[in-house]
A protein has these predicted regions:
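Gram-negative (and chloroplast) outer-membrane scaffold detector with strong preference
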Residues: 46-109, 151
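Cleavable N-terminal export/targeting peptides
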Residues: 1-28
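Surface-exposed, polar helix/loop patches in the mature regions of secreted/periplasmic/lumenal proteins
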Residues: 91-93, 97-135
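Transmembrane beta-strands of outer-membrane beta-barrel proteins
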Residues: 28-32, 60-62, 77, 94-98, ...
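Strand-connecting loop/turn motifs
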Residues: 27-29, 53-57, 89-93, 126-128, ...
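Outer-membrane beta-barrel "beta-signal"
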Residues: 81, 140-153
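N-terminal secretory signal peptides
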Residues: 28-33, 40-55
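Residues that define the transmembrane beta-barrel architecture of outer-membrane proteins
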Residues: 28, 41-45, 71-77, 92-94, ...
Length: 153
């Protein structure tokens, strides 16, 4: 593991711990995620933390994703906010949102840190399963398709 990757993981852990301590423990949730990205073409996995509502239906949901493949390792720290819109008489909730990203890229030729922005949408089931699509702007991966699970639902 390179120095850049270690530093980025520590920075992400610090951001997540501040978010966790700032919210009511009973309304917090943790989740895991995995999927595939386009440009760079990678598989990724990671986790997220979701706060209690900041406003009605609005949650802060920072997440950390580690991507591998295409002779590249990516660590993405995504500081996203989502708006949740429950579907009537359904166990599913639509959500949309976005936020800034810090992307750490590591190859055999060196490493780089780039800023980006994500726009996302997804469906989350009352039992915790979710599906998500993320569009990356600036220097974030162009497109991500993910699936995940939120614990404690």
């Amino acid at each position: 593991m390179t120095r850049l990757t270690r530093v980025s993981l520590w920075a992400a852990a610090a951001v997540m711990s501040v978010a966790v301590s700032a919210s009511d423990a009973s309304a917090q949730s943790l989740g895991v995620r995995a999927g595939a990205s386009v440009d760079p073409d990678q598989f990724y996995f990671g986790g997220h933390y979701e706060t209690a509502p900041l406003a009605e239906h609005v949650h802060f949901r920072p997440n950390l994703e580690l991507g591998v493949g295409n002779d590249l390792t990516t660590v993405a720290v995504n500081l996203e906010v989502v708006y949740k819109a429950p579907l009537r008489r359904q166990p599913w909730t639509f959500y949309g949102g976005g936020g800034p990203a810090i992307n750490f890229y590591d190859t055999d030729r060196g490493s780089d840190t780039e800023g980006g922005f994500n726009i996302l949408g997804g469906l989350e089931h009352d039992k915790g399963l979710f599906f998500e699509v993320k569009f990356g702007l600036i220097d974030s991966p162009d497109l991500k398709f993910g699936i995940g699970y939120v614990f404690g639902k």
